[in-house]
């Protein structure tokens, strides 16, 4: 049976064209727009709301990213975690993934190439508090390792709370030790629990990776590959503090102090150098103020840029889809990488025993071929110094050259040699159409090749392998190493003319004026000639090109013209040319436009016409006379006519000037209307997009302002940019830093702004951390991490009292913010900080949370207005109606005079005022009140006393200690007493005592008998007068006889029996009630169970009946009731 063919739609032909025309629509969704209208208004509203929420979540405050695009600094990736979580193993695995290099020990930062434009610096964060604070300030990405088998530890939570006030960089969680879980269900539950706990601390959806067991000392390659991909594509938002300050992570340190000085004084201040990649903003080249956390503040002695030890792959400007193995570089000078290990006092270099192998399948380049040939050498270089120069393989070595004295006057070189060693490379690139001045600037200035007087040698076309290597950049340019048809190559044609053209064009290139001006080896004439290009011009005129192809290295004659004659000719030609330029009307019009009377439009036209003469740069080429002679003739011919036009233009009448002013007003009005109207294309642009475009435009302007400057001049003006590998020299560093240097602890060099070098009172908004076990007390020392510094100071806490004063607090509030004022270095307001009581690891052995408080800076000042309450009490000793005399409040009349007019009040609330002092010794004073007070009243005066902040500030210098984790500053008073075994002193006035108040005796109220008789009965005195004599019954005692005593005894016994029976009856009744309640509870429980069963049975039957009814109705039959 034949198979059926599939249907293939036609794509060409008449029928296909008709179908294409049918598909053409008028822009609507379909031919029937009503069919595709909104079906549900609620759904559309929800969709619109969701779209708006997504767009709003993407918005953030636009910030200027000052990181350069061409060579950004390496991304600092900090690996942090508690001890034993696998930090070193993770770094080894990642380094192995990026560079194929195995590290035995991690000491210091390690930089690797991660992509075409990205480099990564891995840093292992130690577990001490000082290192965690320093790493939190410079890390771009934090890999937070968590032991999944144990959970979150105290170091992890502390580090998260340190990151928050310092900018909160990117964080990625990594769970390790997953292989310790025996059951899959337990592992799944642990992952879910830790993931949600991690999201609680950061944000919903924070990335969390899972690493299983270790294989061969590394994590599995697939898991490391997934993690490295996320690291490579991670985007970073500029942080505020880092975007305003320069900083670097030192990857190398050297001591440059003279050994003689150290021998004379071992404690002398050291001169050190720190190396590293610059981050943040530009670092000034001279006298930059920096701070090294853990050491102190310094001023740099010298800052210089070095060659990048780990350059990015895109530096060669060659587009590649992936990195080659040679481009996967690694740089870690303080680790055993690359065979070089920097120790404290020596450098270890590992020399590998394997030689360079030339048995490679790939085609070798020029450098590799040279190394191969050096391996085959039988004798080292310099053994046979008289071997001479062998030009050809079948010729003899030439020892000397006989030169005719009549032809050459060998007087030595009188001018500086031109760097012409790259003529061949320039000619090849020019022939290929890829000539660039940057290639010339990158030439090696130490090349000893000199072609002065030997241009004829370049024109030789002899087939030689050595010459072929000299003129070729690579094997691709040669077209094969053993090619016998070199004479047919295009690049060999007209080499002499190309060389002469290259020499003539060398004078047109921009020269480094500063280098020529400050070169002491040049005389003023030579410097002027070098600036004007006279040396290149003279060398071009002195060279006699020989086109004789039969001669090889033919020595040509040198024209002996003096420099002074050339200088005079140049000056004459320059003066003639300048005089002609002053006659040019266009240049004169441009000059006039620089003044107020000049027209802006005329200046723009003049710039467009004259800009063609300045294509070579800011400096005029005065030697290209041939190219400019024709133009100058034309300018001189038209100068007379232009002069007449200018004279006529100067005689403008008043009417023409008014018309010109009216035209300018109209242009200005139209411009304002256009601005009010706005650009119709930008009507939909919101504020966020507009601000980002404004920032981008400003960055382009800033970048273009320095593009035309050489690197040295640019560094003098704006400093060294981020991404530059710099060398910083610092003097007078404490000798402990060098003696106790440990590369495991990070060394950060942070730049300081001018305002941050001053000290004063800093007011902050502070809150005790909710996990810290104790509240903070005023005048207890606290260690602050603010800016680059870590310092200890004494804060005073306060709170705003009715927005009129700052009232001092003895302790911080429990769950709210308060103000804190302390003496320390200034930082910009709104900068975050965190505070701890101690950075020593011994303080953490108690298992408590060490982050004491967090907050932000509010204000910086040199004074403060914190006050505390002062209550003065006194008692009256004389009272005259509303006037009273008070004592025991002041001790002298001077104090009374200071408080005259102050408000006072009594405990009962009667207000008064201080008047005058009445005693010259004891401080008594007269006061008036709004009502009469009693002698028993206490009078008090409420005042506010200013509090002075203690000016104490000391830097945390843990890097100067032998043990970096045990730095101790000022201790608390309780700690000192505990260590010394002293008891807390108890002041008598501060002790709590029982309040003993004397009982008051009131005199009896005497109401006159006449008044008492008029009172109603209820208002009369009820208290009777006590009897002075006892009554009749009180005087006599009742004695019982025997019969009465028997009756009373019997009644007492009967009552006792009755009481006992009543107690037994009540107890029996209570027991019966208890049994009854138990029985009723059982019956109630049984009733509830029975009701539950009945309900379940009823619902089951009812559901069955409903299902039956549904089935019967679905089958189309009517159910019977």
Curated annotation (Swiss-Prot):
Keywords linked to the UniProt accession: ATP-binding, Cytoplasm, Cytoskeleton, GTP-binding, Hydrolase, Nucleotide-binding, Nucleus, Phosphoprotein, Ribosome biogenesis
Amino acid composition bias (Basic and acidic residues), ranges on this chain: 655-665
Bias (Basic residues) ranges: 7-22
Residues covered by region (G5): 211-220
Modified-residue entries (Phosphoserine), positions: 438, 442, 464, 474, 476, 546
GO molecular function, one term: ATP binding
Protein name: Ribosome biogenesis protein bms1
Gene: bms1
InterPro entries, per database record: AARP2CN, Bms1/Tsr1, Bms1_N, BMS1_TSR1_C, G_Bms1/Tsr1_dom, P-loop_NTPase
